Amino acid sequence: MALRTRLGEILRPLNSEYGKVAPGWGTTPIMGVFMLLFFLFLLIILQIYNSSLILENVDVDWATLGN
């Protein structure tokens, strides 16, 4: 038997959609688009860090960050 707590009763409405699945693909394509955009963001950050993406007049040096 599960212990019933006040917090559990407050949070119960948040779990009302448990077990319900949208038919078909649902929002999977949207998730794929956001994953691709996040990957591109990480790739750009990595290229800036490695200085393989050169930006004009932007100094990527740890010493200049303190100024």
Swiss-Prot record:
GO biological process, one term: protein stabilization
GO molecular function, one term: phosphate ion binding
Top-level taxon of the source organism: Eukaryota
Pfam family, one: PsbH
Membrane topology: Single-pass membrane protein
Residue stretches spanning the membrane: 29-49
UniProt entry keywords in alphabetical sequence: Chloroplast, Membrane, Photosynthesis, Photosystem II, Plastid, Thylakoid, Transmembrane, Transmembrane helix
Main location, first listed in the record: plastid
Location within or outside the cell: Plastid, Chloroplast thylakoid membrane
Recorded GO CC terms: chloroplast thylakoid membrane; photosystem II
Entry-linked HAMAP family: PSII_PsbH
Family assignment from sequence similarity: Belongs to the PsbH family.
Subunit structure: PSII is composed of 1 copy each of membrane proteins PsbA, PsbB, PsbC, PsbD, PsbE, PsbF, PsbH, PsbI, PsbJ, PsbK, PsbL, PsbM, PsbT, PsbX, PsbY, PsbZ, Psb30/Ycf12, at least 3 peripheral proteins of the oxygen-evolving complex and a large number of cofactors. It forms dimeric complexes.
Functional note: One of the components of the core complex of photosystem II (PSII), required for its stability and/or assembly. PSII is a light-driven water:plastoquinone oxidoreductase that uses light energy to abstract electrons from H(2)O, generating O(2) and a proton gradient subsequently used for ATP formation. It consists of a core antenna complex that captures photons, and an electron transfer chain that converts photonic excitation into a charge separation.
UniProt-listed PANTHER family: PHOTOSYSTEM II REACTION CENTER PROTEIN H (PTHR34469:SF4)
UniProt-recorded name of the protein: Photosystem II reaction center protein H
Organism for this UniProt entry: Gracilaria tenuistipitata var. liui
Originating gene: psbH
